[in-house]
């Protein structure tokens, strides 16, 4: 079993809280995630601050717009320092290919030899079968598989998906196709997520990155919680 990397979600309404938590996490995890709430409040400067602290940054904004807008947004994200970005695969081929172009342009802007990771969002882990739009008759896992295979064809590096779909995605898209799994919970509680897994389950399924938020950031010792999660994966 390959060891996945831990990504801690900094889901805060302003930058100082996020930076304070990041300071407590230094040395315990390689990645942090900046989502819509924090990025809207803090802007691109939060990426610089986190990278100056030694973290790789997953900018989780799930771009979904007309192709030219997404191209520019991805380019700007890379220029701002994002190491991983994502788009909604439901945006289709032209939007995804524009995102790939924006990624390349961002690399030129930053002088990067290796491009950041570009992922496609399949179906949110907060959704279950009954949450899919009326008229979409495919089983949820089939929707995920179709979107994942499309992302591969369009030039993306991988997908954001629940742990339940990782094994089938790896089979249909190849073991080098990255699977980043949110909704990771050390215990049974699922909060606002539906399709959750423990770190051990997701690692055994083949996830490459595990996104954990409140179980780490809400702990009395966040760094200790991060270490414990990864130790549980090593022993799985």
UniProtKB/Swiss-Prot annotation:
Catalytic site: 62 (proton donor)
The entry's keywords: Decarboxylase, Lyase, Pyrimidine biosynthesis
An annotated GO cellular component: cytosol
Reactions catalysed according to its record: orotidine 5'-phosphate + H(+) = UMP + CO2
Role this protein plays: Catalyzes the decarboxylation of orotidine 5'-monophosphate (OMP) to uridine 5'-monophosphate (UMP).
Assembly and interaction partners: Homodimer.
Pathway field: Pyrimidine metabolism; UMP biosynthesis via de novo pathway; UMP from orotate: step 2/2
SUPFAM superfamilies in the record: Ribulose-phoshate binding barrel
Source organism per UniProt: Oleidesulfovibrio alaskensis (strain ATCC BAA-1058 / DSM 17464 / G20)
Keyword Lyase: yes
Residues annotated for substrate binding in this entry: 11, 33, 60-69, 125, 185, 193, 213-214
EC number: 4.1.1.23
Entry's Gene Ontology BP terms: 'de novo' pyrimidine nucleobase biosynthetic process; 'de novo' UMP biosynthetic process
One Gene Ontology molecular-function label: orotidine-5'-phosphate decarboxylase activity
Source taxon at top rank: Bacteria
Similarity remark: Belongs to the OMP decarboxylase family. Type 1 subfamily.
Listed name of the protein: Orotidine 5'-phosphate decarboxylase
């Amino acid at each position: 079993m390959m060891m996945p990397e831990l990504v801690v979600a900094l889901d805060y309404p302003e930058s100082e809280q996020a930076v304070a938590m990041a300071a407590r996490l230094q040395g315990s995890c390689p990645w942090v995630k900046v989502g819509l709430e924090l990025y809207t409040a803090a802007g691109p400067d939060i990426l610089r601050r986190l990278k100056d602290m030694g973290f790789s940054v997953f900018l989780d904004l799930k771009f979904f717009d007309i192709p030219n807008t997404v191209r520019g947004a991805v380019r700007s994200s890379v220029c701002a320092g994002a190491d991983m970005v994502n788009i909604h695969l439901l945006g289709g081929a032209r939007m995804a290919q524009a995102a790939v172009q924006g990624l390349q342009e961002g690399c030129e802007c930053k002088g990067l030899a290796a491009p950041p990771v570009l992922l496609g969002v399949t179906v949110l882990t907060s959704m279950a079968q009954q949450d899919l739009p009326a008229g979409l008759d495919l089983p949820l896992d089939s929707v995920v598989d179709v979107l994942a295979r499309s992302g591969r064809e369009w030039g993306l590096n991988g997908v954001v998906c629940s742990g339940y779909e990782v094994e089938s995605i790896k089979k249909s898209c190849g073991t080098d196709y990255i699977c980043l799994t949110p909704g990771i919970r050390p215990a049974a509680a699922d909060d606002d997520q539906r399709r959750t897994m423990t770190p051990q389950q997701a690692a055994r399924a083949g996830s490459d990155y595990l996104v954990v938020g409140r179980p780490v950031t809400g702990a009395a010792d966040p760094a200790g919680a991060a270490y414990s999660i990864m130790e549980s994966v090593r022993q799985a």
